[in-house]
């Protein structure tokens, strides 16, 4: 039986995670180790993880189906990195989510096969780009960003450019506003038109708020 570790299911969200009324399903674990992490509980060994089956998660998120249908809302998968759990998400959505708007928040730093598996089910992609400069990206989270770029190019080739929002943060000690603009220009050249710019404000314990 397929199971996945979750850090939370947050219902009745409006205007924060996709279209209309949305339920956020947040997964544990991530391939990155960012210096400032929005959800550090998705990484820690002592996190209060809920291990759930697709059937149990569907029972929870289906409670608000009337709101989804009335507002063109649905479900957003975040984390952590939800694309690490692509098979789980596919099984979950096949239980009955055809009329829901499905959004995924992702770093895209995952194998292409994970992206391909969920491609028929996802309407919107919110991509946490960090920075397009490979040196800045690696200094910030310890990984290369070539996989991010190649996955992004693949989505664009599939005609999804208008369904992608790229998040480009201003990260203290790692990039500048000029770096943000440079990333934006590189992404625009690829065909991306939707961006989310914000600034990290560091607080205690290497967390941040926006």
Predicted feature descriptions by range:
Residues 16, 21, 48, 52, ...:
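Residues at secondary-structure transition points
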Residues 18-20, 206-210:
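Short aromatic-enriched loop/helix-cap "lid" or pocket-rim segments at secondary-structure transitions
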């Amino acid at each position: 039986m397929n199971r996945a570790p979750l850090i939370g299911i947050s219902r009745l969200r409006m205007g924060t995670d996709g279209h209309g009324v949305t339920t956020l399903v947040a997964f544990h674990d991530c391939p990155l180790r960012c210096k400032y992490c929005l959800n550090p509980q998705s990484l820690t060994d002592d996190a209060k993880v809920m291990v759930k089956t697709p059937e149990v998660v569907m029972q929870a998120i289906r409670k608000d189906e009337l709101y989804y249908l009335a507002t063109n809302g649905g479900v957003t998968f975040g984390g952590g990195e939800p694309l690490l759990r692509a098979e789980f998400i596919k099984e979950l959505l096949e239980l009955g989510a055809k009329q829901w708007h499905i959004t995924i928040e992702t770093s895209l730093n995952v194998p292409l096969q994970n992206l391909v598996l969920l491609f028929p089910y996802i309407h919107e992609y919110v991509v946490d780009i960090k920075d397009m400069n490979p040196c800045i990206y690696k200094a910030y989270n310890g990984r290369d960003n070539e996989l991010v770029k190649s996955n992004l190019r693949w989505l664009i080739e599939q005609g999804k450019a208008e369904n992608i929002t790229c998040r480009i943060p201003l990260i203290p000690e790692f990039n500048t506003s000029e770096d943000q603009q440079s990333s934006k220009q590189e992404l625009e050249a690829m065909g991306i038109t939707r961006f989310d710019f914000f600034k990290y404000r560091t607080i205690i314990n290497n967390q941040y708020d926006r």
